Amino acid sequence: MNTIKRILAVIDPTKDDQHGLARSVELAKKSGATITAFMTVYDFSYEMTTMLSGDEREAMREAVLKDRELWLNDLVSPYNNLNIETLVVWHNRPYEAIIETVIDQNYDLVIKSTHQHGALKSVIFTPTDWHLVRKCPTPVLFVKEMAWPENGNILAAVNAVSENDQHIALNKRIIKDAQFLCELANAKLNLVNAYPATPINIAIEIPEFNPSLYNESVKKHHIESTNALATEFTLTNEQCFIEEG
């Protein structure tokens, strides 16, 4: 991703604040991208209306869509100085509707807000979020309610020791995409690589096994591999973080 021309901003009709839309606007101002404010709608009572005629069922569906379209148009009205359009789709599986739209209309980026657990103060990924992570063919950016800080940090997670060609290619794509976002957000890029802890069962089953020595050897291998990967992208060792986990 070295350019962003089209952004799909996923709207959550159950929320008053649309953080995904706000971040989309920020990126659009910096990249010149167009935005589509996207929302799925489905009324499950529609499935209970088998006694109605086909025309009556269609009229009911159109009424629901029209109501949501008016609401969405009102939501984006403060941004009329940007190239922003709206799209409401009737679908009972939001992630499928999002992915189909991304494929059909060639979007470069999907931006969606996350949900925060009130008691735990932590981010919760919904089933829709997980489906998008696994299946969406274009990058997905999940955002929280806080604004992006100026001169902030972007952390790119890599698997620096992998010898799998797909993983190696993914590492490079992650770093390149992160570099592009750093340019837009005026941020600093850092890499993080995790290495596995020493298996406890080995230490128990093999008395002469030295877990500390093994752990240091694994850590050293990951440090060297991460630093080498960073060098390919003119990043310093100080921008690399290698942690057990």
Name the predicted role of every residue range.
Residues 55-70, 210-221:
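A short acidic, glycine-rich active-site loop
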Residues 1-3, 23, 76-110, 117, ...:
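Structural beta-alpha unit
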Residues 38-40, 87-91, 143, 192-194, ...:
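Conserved beta-strand termini and adjacent loop/short-helix elements that scaffold enzyme active sites
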Residues 2-55, 153-208, 216, 231-232, ...:
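Small/aliphatic-rich secondary-structure junction motif
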Residues 17, 65, 91-92, 122, ...:
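A conditional alpha-helix N-cap/helix-loop micro-motif detector
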Residues 94-98, 128, 225:
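Short acidic active-site motifs
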Residues 3-5, 99-150:
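Gly/Ser-rich helix-loop-strand patches that form or flank binding pockets
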